[in-house]
């Protein structure tokens, strides 16, 4: 039976240059056996494509922007989910980007655009202070929690996508398109935006994962190549 493995990228498929080479070899063997491999990352298109080219990463599909965009290996957009345009002005105000160290928005295959562009798939904001970042995130969740997913990602950064999508929902859309059953889907990750896909499928945690993800996982592994030894 064909299997599908979906892996987060940062701190999962990529830990360091040595680790990613082992993972690439294991994935190639997995694909050659008739299985499918998907990267699911919070990165936008340009940021991920730089890594794909740098490390010559092989995959069947890639899910970017925490699930908001799915591409095939020829970079054709298979699915995309945007945030409601009518909330973008108030969201920009509530993010207090004048106090941010940096921010950018993503749409389609564009990774560095402004709020005014509309039809946004993701917003990234980094602040100078973690306490301030946490306060912004809490306020956003109270006001927009029914229409937006707000993720703490790293450092003092938060990223925002539509509530209608996440990595798990994108996997479901993709699995229906390619005809793979839920019981044949395996997932691995380490961060907050990975938790739902770990819960919904045969999910494994990296050893250095957030605690909530570890509690939801079937087991823990050191790397993707280790997981591929027994699935």
Where are these regions (language model features)?
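Hydrophobic beta-strand scaffold residues
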Residues: 13, 37, 102-103, 203, ...
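Short active-site oxyanion
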Residues: 34-38, 58-60, 182-185, 199-203
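Non-catalytic pre-domain segments flanking phosphatase-related domains
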Residues: 1-7, 22, 176-180
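Short acidic-hydrophobic, aromatic-tinged amphipathic segments that line or gate anion-handling sites
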Residues: 218-226
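Active-site metal-binding loops of divalent metal-dependent hydrolases
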Residues: 9-11, 43, 190-191
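Conserved acidic, metal-coordinating active-site core of Asp-based
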Residues: 98-200, 208, 215
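Asp-based phosphoryl-transfer active-site loop
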Residues: 2-19, 39, 198
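Active-site phosphate-binding/coordination module
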Residues: 20-112
């Amino acid at each position: 039976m064909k299997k599908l493995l979906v892996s987060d990228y940062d701190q999962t498929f990529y830990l360091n240059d040595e680790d990613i080479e082992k993972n690439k070899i294991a994935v190639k063997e997995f694909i050659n056996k008739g299985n499918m491999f998907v990267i699911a990352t919070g990165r936008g298109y340009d940021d991920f494509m730089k890594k794909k080219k740098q490390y010559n990463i092989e995959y069947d599909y890639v899910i970017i922007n925490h699930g908001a965009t799915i591409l095939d290996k020829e970079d054709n957009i298979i699915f995309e989910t945007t945030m409601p345009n009518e909330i973008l002005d108030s969201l920009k105000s509530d993010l207090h980007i004048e106090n941010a160290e940096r921010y950018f928005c993503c749409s389609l295959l564009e990774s560095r655009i402004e709020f005014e562009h509309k039809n946004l798939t993701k917003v990234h904001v980094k602040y100078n202070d973690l306490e301030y970042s946490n306060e912004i995130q809490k306020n956003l969740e109270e006001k927009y929690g029914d229409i937006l997913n707000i993720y703490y990602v790293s450092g003092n950064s938060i990223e925002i996508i539509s509530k209608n999508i996440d990595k798990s929902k994108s996997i479901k859309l993709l699995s229906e398109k390619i005809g793979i059953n839920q019981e044949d889907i395996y997932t691995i990750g380490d961060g907050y935006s990975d938790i739902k896909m770990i819960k919904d499928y045969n999910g494994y945690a990296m050893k250095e994962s957030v605690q909530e993800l570890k509690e939801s996982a079937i087991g823990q592994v050191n790397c993707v190549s280790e997981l591929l030894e027994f699935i």
